[in-house]
Amino acid sequence: MNPVRLALFAVMLLMVFCGPVLAQRSGPEFRRPLACEPLEPRTRLEAIESRYERVITKGFSHFATMTVRGIELRLDAIEMKDSTDSTRAIGLVIALWELGEKPRENRSFIDYQEIDRLLKGMESVARVNETITKLAGFEARYRTLGDLEINVFRQTRSGTAASLSSGICDRVTALLTLDDLEKLRGHIIEAKARLDEIK
């Protein structure tokens, strides 16, 4: 047999048998894709959480769990410490779980110094109504440094509603009533009062 034909035949066999192996994907990804991670931590709590080769301690108090339209929302007051250099941060963590066949979770950290701004932002967006514009629809939003986003908007038929979202790429969104938003605001005030005690 001709050596050129033999080489071509060998290359074809390699392509037929090795092609499917090369086309297979690697195992599951447990971390968010790199494009979803901010280059630098945006809150003090995230800065401590993202450290490696350190002992990080966390203390937390649970303040509320709300289930609204297939989303479970959890609010905790949190304290984190890095035992290596005595760095300490306190604040809130709000986690959203999307219930169902493929549950998803996302959470947002809110530093203590940002809580008052969050409360004012929640109060401001909750007061927004159709008088802010002469157009048919309206929307107001407030976003924290840790990517917790609160929206208040006009629904087509049923008046004003709110939403709470967490995350960068794979966002989890809870649809709320204005009463739900006010309850959450009350729980945040309670959690801040607890953090004031340990500040």
What name fits each language-model region?
Residues 1-6:
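Positively charged n-region of N-terminal signal peptides that target proteins for export
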Residues 22-199:
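Positively charged, low-complexity terminal tracts
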Residues 7-17:
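Bacterial N-terminal signal peptides
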